[in-house]
Each structure stands twice: as C-alpha cells, then as structure tokens.
Amino acid sequence: ELEKTIAAAMNEISNSRQGQTSISEFEIPAYSNDGKLKLYELLLRKYSDLINEFEKKTVGEIKSMVDRDNLTVQSLCERFVAGDYSFERNYEAAVSKVLEFISGEIVYVKSDIDLNFWLTPNEILEKMVGDDEDIAVLLCSVLFALGDEKAEVVIAEMDNRTTHALVITEHNGKFFIFDATQKHKINDFSGDKAGVLSRYSFRGSRIKRFLYKFNRNNYEQFM
C-alpha cells in the first residue's frame, strides 16, 4: 500500500507539471488541486527516511527483481511475440516493439525527493509511470522472458553528476544499450562496446562510469 500511495502521488505530480491532473475520469486544471499535490509532496519529504529504510534491499532481493516468471512480465512479453518465436531469429524485432511500447506509453518520472523505492511490474503498468530504475528493471525482466540471459540493469554515473538506469546486453556479436526512458530505435546504441558507450547520451549527458549492474543471476559493483 505504501508503494502504491507513493506511485499515485508521483503520477499526479508528474501530470500536474504537464498541465493537468486526473481525478477519477475527469481532468481538471492543475491549480485546482494544488493543495492536494503540495500535501503529497510534504508527506513524501517528511517520511522519506522511513520509506528509504523500509525499501532497503539485499543483493539477493535486488537480483530477484529481474523476474521473467512474473505474470505481468509474461503477459507483456506475449503481446510482442508470435507462437513460433525464436530467440536467435526474432529477438531484436521483439525488443524493438517492447522498447517502443515502454518508452511511448509509460511516463518517466525522476523524483526530486530523496526517495529510494522500487515499483513492481504490475504497479508500473497499472499507473503507467515509473522512474528510470523501475523502467530499466521492467525492461530487463521482459528481455529475460524473451530468452536474453545476458541483459543487465546498469546504474550509471553521468557526467553531470546525476545517476541514470539503463539496460545493456549483447546479441549476435553486437553490444546494445536500451534506455526506455527516452525514445530511440533498437540500433541507435548498438555496435562495438566502446563506441556505444561513448555515443550514448541521456538529455545531453554522457556516461562517466558504471556504479553497479545486475540481473537475475549476477550483481557487480564498481564503486
């Protein structure tokens, strides 16, 4: 319930910054609900330490978030593959569709409140909102369900001193970066690893270094 409340609050704050807030099935101007949004933000800031403590995860728990057996992940995966799906033949085409859906339909929200919590795939798709880490874990889980055991979530330090989550993998001799928080084609960030890492950017910022990466089977920290 705590995670759902936070997600709902972040979703309404995000919508308000785009000019409108959803209340039931009606849309009203953001200023009409300004008090409610301020209260959400105040509560999140006030209880941020408690939330962060509650949301702490062990390495094992972090790895387990990349879950191909999750029913929501499986359902999402099935939307983009045919019955005769082959990892070798059809993987990149399926990823292209998944990437287009997630980047186009799920609203990326970067909270300006110091909160560290993780949404489940079901919560992300219920509210159609998530931060970069939530979205990266969801994408990596779908890639895992498509048969990609090399895909990993990476938390990177950017050259503007922020952090950003993305997904890396290798397929048919090519290195890929997938970032579903921004719209891009599957091959925009693909090729030799050094070239891809130097070419990738998020809102004008480039990767300075990897902090840590993980998937279902591995966790590696670089700090």
Regions found by a protein language model. Name each.
Residues 1-223:
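A structural boundary/capping signal
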